[in-house]
């Protein structure tokens, strides 16, 4: 970046993790849990200078003495005071920048309520005094990151899963589907089925261990029934995992039973359609003329699409639902855990994007509603 060209900041706020960094970089510099913790009791130790709140990794490590809150539920901000703390932490502690010196690109969930985008805009200009800002839809950024402007994105993170059909860079709101089943639910489910095996995981600390087991050992079976038979008849699918205390546990069919819930939400007692059916339903809500482009450009995005085998299984399931001659292509970029952020980094550094920013002046003239005119 040249001196007169100040780097824009890109902040992707997810339900589970916040990803932040500078436009033009190829990966976020800061990735930390979207958590705000407050002390349960007034200062136990005198003179400790106990803070009234902790954010991210520090909140995670001190969780024994804190009450933890996630300000983003199912992808949508529900607690603005805590959200402000997360942004403050992002700018001042993680990136170490002055927000009044950089344009800021924020991301939002598909179908984010209008009032929420206005509130984000207001906080950026009034609390952080940013010179300019923009709000982009997460799935659209993932599509850009894959080098496309038309396609359907299956974005599954920690708190929510969406299928978002996009045509020429614009999300089609009537066809967006939301599924409240994502990484956090899969971790809970794995805790449950490991308990059935005789291992007890209950506390928040143990939940983090199970999340690690999920990320390291789970995979999606191409044929679930057959995989179950293989698991029953042999020990070839068993893997061992060493817990922090040195105990070694063995995990078998749980490895693929856990992510199978994405395709069969009934495993979690949910009546919803699986991710394959949801994707298909989303495509069917679109104009018949663009369906071919969506089938051929189905892009996976988000941490909960990182399971090995998920792309092949999606290919198989959607092929079974789609018209027989349809060409179906599932794109699973290796960096898809961060593709929303990467798409934001690409967008904010395009020369053609520079006139798209909402400036402080425009905000002062029009108020928060300017966001609906300039970001869509």
From Swiss-Prot:
Q: What is its EC number?
A: 3.6.4.-
According to the UniProt record, list the residues that bear N-acetylaspartate. Answer: 3
Sorted alphabetically, the keyword list is:
Acetylation, ATP-binding, Cytoplasm, Cytoskeleton, Hydrolase, Methylation, Nucleotide-binding, Oxidation
Where is this chain's protein located in or outside the cell?
Cytoplasm, Cytoskeleton
Q: How is the protein altered post-translationally, as described in the entry?
A: Oxidation of Met-45 and Met-48 by MICALs (MICAL1, MICAL2 or MICAL3) to form methionine sulfoxide promotes actin filament depolymerization. MICAL1 and MICAL2 produce the (R)-S-oxide form. The (R)-S-oxide form is reverted by MSRB1 and MSRB2, which promotes actin repolymerization.
SMART domains, alphabetically? ACTIN (SM00268)
Q: Give the catalytic activity.
A: ATP + H2O = ADP + phosphate + H(+)
The domain of life is Eukaryota
Residues bearing the modification Tele-methylhistidine: 74
Residues modified to Methionine (R)-sulfoxide:
45, 48
User: Which residues in this protein are found as N-acetylcysteine?
Assistant: 2
Q: What are the N6-methyllysine sites (modified residues) in this protein?
A: 85
Annotated Gene Ontology cellular components are: cytoplasm; cytoskeleton
Q: Which GO terms describe its molecular function?
A: ATP binding; hydrolase activity
**SUPFAM superfamilies (UniProt xref):** Actin-like ATPase domain
The record, for InterPro entries, names: Actin, Actin/actin-like_CS, Actin_CS, ATPase_NBD
Sorted alphabetically, which CDD domains does this protein's record hold?
Answer: ASKHA_NBD_actin (cd10224)
Task of the protein? Actins are highly conserved proteins that are involved in various types of cell motility and are ubiquitously expressed in all eukaryotic cells.
Q: Which family does it belong to?
A: Belongs to the actin family.
Specify the protein name: Actin, cytoplasmic
Top-level taxonomy: Eukaryota, Metazoa, Spiralia, Lophotrochozoa, Mollusca
